[in-house]
Amino acid sequence: MIIKQEELEKICLNLYPYFFDYKDITLHDINIKIDDYLHVKANLNYYNIETKIKAIARVVVKDQIIINFDGIVKYGFINLDLKKVLTELIKDNPYLQIEPDCIKIANDYIKEITLEDGLVKIELK
C-alpha cells in the first residue's frame, strides 16, 4: 500500500476525532512532508487559544509500530515539549502507549513501513 503526503494529511484530519475526543481541542489543518522522516506542522484550537505543533518522527515496525519523535507545541507565546503534552493527552488511550522516547502502537497487521520521496509505503503481513 502506498500513501501520498496529501492522503496522509486527510487521514490524520479524519482520524483525529477518534484518538483525541476533546470538544475544546480541534485540529484545523495539518501539513506533512515525507523524506526519510515525517515532518509535521499542525494548527489546533486548544480551548480557544491558537496552538501550533511542529514535529519530526521516524517510524519503525517490530512487534509494535514504534514512532520516535521530537517536537514543540507553541501554546500562545509559551513553548511546550511535545512529548510531555502527548503523555498527558494519551495516558488513558488504550491503543497508544507513550514512553519517554517514543509512541508504541499494537501491531498485528503491518510488516514494514518505509518513508521516501513524499510517500509512505506499507507492507502488510
Regions found by a protein language model. Name each.
Residues M1-K125:
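Extracellular/lumenal and peripheral-membrane lipid-interaction modules
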